[in-house]
Amino acid sequence: MDHRLLSFISAPLPSLIASLARHGGFGAWFVGGCVRDALLARPSNDIDIVVGPGGEDLPRAVAARIGGSFFPLDEERGHARVVLKGEGASCDFAPLQGGTIAADLALRDFTINALAVSCGSDDLLDPLGGAADLAQRVIRACSAGAFAADPLRIVRAYRFAAHLDFEIHAATLALIPDHAPLLATVAGERIRDELFRMLDLPHAVPYVLKMSCAGVTGAIFGADDLPADTAAGALDRVESLCRDLSAFGTEAEPVRARLRQEVQPGITIRALAKLAAFLNGAGIPAGIASQRLMLGKAATRLLELLCSSARLTWPAPAAAPDPHALFTLFCHREPAGCEQLILPLAEGILPEDRCRHLAAYLTRQHIPRGGRLLLTGDDIMILLGLPPGRQVGEAIELLRAAQSTGEVRTRAEAQRYLAKKQLTTPEPLR
């Protein structure tokens, strides 16, 4: 047996699963991505197991032995997941399809995922030549009907190619244009998950361009005659900037950390910025993309702000930028942070020196809504003698503005500032 597979099946969790299956007297196989990644010597936190008749209780038995959490994914079809506590690893269990493991593997998307290792004999099962395709670094559909069975596999083909740095086999590529229109029938959240996983990779541009030339992105967003080169060019400029943030000077690391944050599960700000660049280049409104991809409210809002950032008239350079003007500008564009500078910088709309000034303000001075202030709401109620309500919120906003513009720098200054505002405001904070 290949030493990489031997290392995989000898690890504690696979070894336990295989032992339970052997003692239970039923067939079970490690399949798909975990076998592929083992052969590629790539780390993997997810294990997929196909279970033969009689092994229905295997997921619960595994969960009990490792102290993991059991989750039924589809009780009717017998799909279940076991999650290891504190390790981020999971095992997905599914019943055998088609009566034999060879028939089960033939129903899968690509040959590199149609690989299995038997829990009973530790043998590699490779009926479709997936190991050879791994060696040749190609993505090949398991059958001519693979895309008709699930059109999402078209997007997955490009995502796997980008993730593994593989090429899509010519015969598989030839199937894509005729099947791409079927993507209109695929649920938006399924497309979203695959698309954002690809966009979050550091070198997604060539694969997005190939998708566009094959009619895939046009089918996803309902855009005929999508300008593939223009859209890919816009994406390339932003992707390059996301890799090399030196244009942000001393703020590069805070910006990098910001781009890694998720705006909703599975969607980083970096990937959303790259999508915004592509949409602008393709002439696709952010609202249409948000609706098609079933984005949540926060991601929808941020995508709209990112798309509009390349059309915004940014403040002209000044020796001493007005902090009040900056506070007003960025308040109206919350929750966007430094990421909103990336598209205009990439398009040459925002000069690099001005970008650094704005990034410094956003990272060092501007306090977003909900950010930490010098005084809490309770502090303000005690200081001003206010009951809970609207006036406390108004006082918080006054303090946020004062801190963001540099008028207030210490707790004592904050107390004096609000006390003075209470005395001088035409409508007192009462």
Curated annotation (Swiss-Prot):
GO terms for molecular function: CC tRNA cytidylyltransferase activity; CCACCA tRNA nucleotidyltransferase activity; metal ion binding; nucleotide binding; tRNA binding. It catalyses: a tRNA precursor + 2 CTP = a tRNA with a 3' CC end + 2 diphosphate. InterPro entries: NT_sf, PolA_pol_head_dom, PolyA_RNA-bd, tRNA_CCA-adding_enzyme. One of its GO terms (biological process) is tRNA surveillance. Keywords: Magnesium, Metal-binding, Nucleotide-binding, Nucleotidyltransferase, RNA-binding, Transferase, tRNA processing, tRNA-binding. Disulfide bonds: none annotated. The keyword Metal-binding applies. Mg(2+) binds at D46, D48. Its EC number is 2.7.7.-. CTP binds at residues 33-36, 108-109, 113, 150-159, 190. It is an enzyme of class 2 (transferase). Pfam families: PolyA_pol, PolyA_pol_RNAbd. Its cofactor is Mg(2+). Belongs to the tRNA nucleotidyltransferase/poly(A) polymerase family. PANTHER family: CC-ADDING TRNA NUCLEOTIDYLTRANSFERASE, MULTIFUNCTIONAL CCA PROTEIN. tRNA nucleotidyltransferase involved in the synthesis of the tRNA CCA terminus. Adds the two cytidine residues to tRNA. This is CC-adding tRNA nucleotidyltransferase.
